[in-house]
């Protein structure tokens, strides 16, 4: 869990001096133990504009401040939502308020849920990471592993994540079994091989131990059905509705799963109703779902509105907004439009990348390499972004980097690197790279992955050459 310890008030100002345009910040801190209902907050305010701020209420979840007849809440659990919906008129002050908090390692569902998604993990601060590193608790091992695996902050983060997950699993952390199962799906373990049998073994053990992360992932798999699970959206719907009706502390992202199930059952109105409820309860994944439903209705205004709301709430996926803008439309604008769009795109994609969104790395890499959308051509930046996208498991980054390096690959080692990037692209979901993967395999560039390729990536047996057992479709 995370517990808040201090209220911080920052007042930004600059002197009333025509010759001085510098902005300054006055910071005042209040200890949680000193805050109580009715307390008047005294703080440095050179402008004298904000007086009479009182504490309305204090709880472990945050606090509510009053200013005249207006109320302002700071929610520790879901920062983008007010603390309650009791008809209160929450209004933002024109100053910066935030809670300083510290992560508390606990063997509780609430603690583990903080590390289920990239958006949640992206909220971790340096002090949080140091606290996790200093802890020997199995729960901290799992949490630190998720930070490494979902954000890939270091070159060996994948190996570190696996080590931490195995340590946590040995100590009995159910969610660690689920985390390891997901690594086998993408070939991210030390074996460097996609292995669905191992994935299922670890997943089933996680489910048997009561892992909510495993239940969440398995429910999502069963909505559409795949190699990992049967297609049964009606069963998922019933399971999640029961969960929402009977559990008192529900993880908000279950609303997104229920909405997905209704969408798969061709009930878009019900799906939208559930997604809206999810937003109200703190789900971040419901924002892009509502945005895409608006796009399907060709309602661009509502689409943009939901994407912008998602960004404000901290949904990393929403930062790809306008990522599909083509060069022709960009060039049709005037210079002011181009400068504005180019700057906004770069800032937006950088923010998404900091939240672990590999697709943002792809956009940054693509435009840095091609010089499109007003980006300056910079191959060094392009390679840096694309390699980050590869580390984050983005199939488009893998494919583009392979395309770029293929034209420059002269040595056997360089050609093998390109082939491995193609394999990663296919592992991460880019099916249209499978033809080239097959050719790389026939050329002997992927012999060490023979078992995986023949089991998962080649067609039926009648397409295999009897002499060498390889795919003969391109002979």
List the model feature ranges, each with a label.
Residues 308-315, 416-431:
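TPR/TPR-like (Sel1-like) alpha-helical repeat modules
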Residues 143-150, 179-188, 217-226, 256, ...:
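Hydrophobic face of amphipathic alpha-helices that form TPR/SEL1-like repeat modules
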Residues 1-117, 124:
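Surface-exposed, beta-sheet-biased, low-hydrophobicity segments with strongly acidic/polar composition
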Residues 135-137, 150-151, 171-174, 187-188, ...:
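Short helix-capping/linker turns of helical repeat alpha-solenoids
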């Amino acid at each position: 869990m995370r517990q808040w310890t201090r209220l911080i008030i920052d007042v930004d100002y600059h002197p009333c001096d025509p010759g001085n345009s510098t902005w300054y910040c006055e910071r005042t801190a209040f200890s949680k133990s000193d805050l109580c209902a009715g307390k008047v907050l005294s703080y440095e305010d050179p402008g004298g504009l904000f007086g009479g701020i009182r504490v309305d209420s204090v709880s472990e979840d945050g606090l509510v401040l009053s200013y005249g007849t207006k109320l302002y809440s700071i929610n520790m659990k879901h920062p983008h939502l007010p603390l309650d919906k009791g008809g209160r008129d929450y209004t933002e002050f024109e100053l910066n308020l935030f809670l300083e908090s510290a992560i508390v390692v606990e063997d509780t569902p609430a603690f583990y849920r903080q590390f289920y998604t990239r958006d949640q993990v992206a909220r971790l601060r340096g002090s949080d990471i140091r606290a996790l590193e200093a802890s020997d608790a199995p729960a901290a091992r799992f949490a630190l592993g998720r930070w490494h695996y979902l954000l890939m902050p270091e070159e060996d983060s994948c190996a570190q994540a696996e080590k931490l997950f195995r340590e946590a699993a040995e100590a009995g952390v159910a969610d660690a079994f689920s985390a390891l199962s997901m690594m086998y799906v993408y070939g991210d373990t030390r074996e460097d091989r996609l292995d669905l049998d191992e994935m299922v073994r670890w997943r089933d053990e996680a489910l048997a131990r009561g892992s909510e992360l495993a239940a969440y992932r398995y429910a999502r798999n069963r909505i559409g059905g795949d190699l990992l699970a049967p297609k049964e959206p009606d069963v998922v719907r019933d399971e999640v509705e029961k969960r929402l009706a009977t559990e008192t502390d529900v993880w908000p992202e279950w609303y997104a799963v229920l909405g997905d199930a209704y969408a798969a059952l061709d009930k878009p109105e019900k799906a939208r109703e559930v997604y809206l409820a999810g937003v109200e309860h703190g789900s971040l994944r419901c924002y892009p779902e509502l945005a895409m439903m608006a796009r399907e209705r060709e309602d661009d205004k509502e689409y943009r509105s939901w994407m912008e709301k998602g960004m404000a709430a901290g949904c990393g996926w929403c930062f790809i907004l306008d990522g599909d803008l083509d060069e022709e439309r960009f060039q049709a604008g005037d210079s002011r439009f181009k400068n504005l769009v180019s700057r906004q795109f770069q800032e937006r994609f950088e923010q998404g990348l900091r939240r672990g969104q590999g697709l943002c790395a792809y956009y940054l890499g693509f435009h840095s390499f091609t010089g499109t959308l007003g980006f300056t051509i910079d191959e060094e930046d392009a390679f840096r972004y694309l390699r980050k996208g590869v580390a984050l498991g983005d199939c488009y980054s893998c494919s583009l980097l392979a395309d770029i390096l293929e034209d420059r690959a002269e040595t056997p080692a360089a050609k093998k690197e390109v082939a491995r990037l193609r394999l990663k692209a296919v592992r991460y979901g880019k099916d249209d790279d499978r033809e080239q993967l097959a050719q790389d395999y026939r050329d002997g560039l992927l012999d060490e992955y023979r078992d995986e390729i023949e089991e998962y990536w080649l067609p039926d047996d009648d397409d295999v050459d009897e002499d060498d057992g390889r795919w003969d479709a391109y002979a």
